[in-house]
Amino acid sequence: VDDPKIAEYRKAHEEITGSVPDYWASANTYAALQILEQAIVGAGTLDKETVTQDIKDNTFDTVKGDLSFKNNFSNTFWSVGQWQDGVFRGVKGSNVDGAAPVRLKDGWK
């Protein structure tokens, strides 16, 4: 993975758990927990409505970069990935930089 934050996360995950994290959901799950932690701290309470409002109103520093939500949706994400030379790379996304060109495989048109 070319992104330094995700590479650091993957290394720490493997050191702590002894298992290699998957290339799709693991960092997403960790980012969601980072958002929740920051929202609780920002809200200063565990009250569901207050924490929810903090998530709606703020941008959060996560392993996947700065994330925010509009109408309950984050518009920053990778939607398609492809294995290339043993590395899982993002090839299509929304508001993300660094997409690798899609490599057509033999027989693809």
What are the language-model segments listed below?
Residues 1-109:
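Extracytosolic ligand-binding ectodomains
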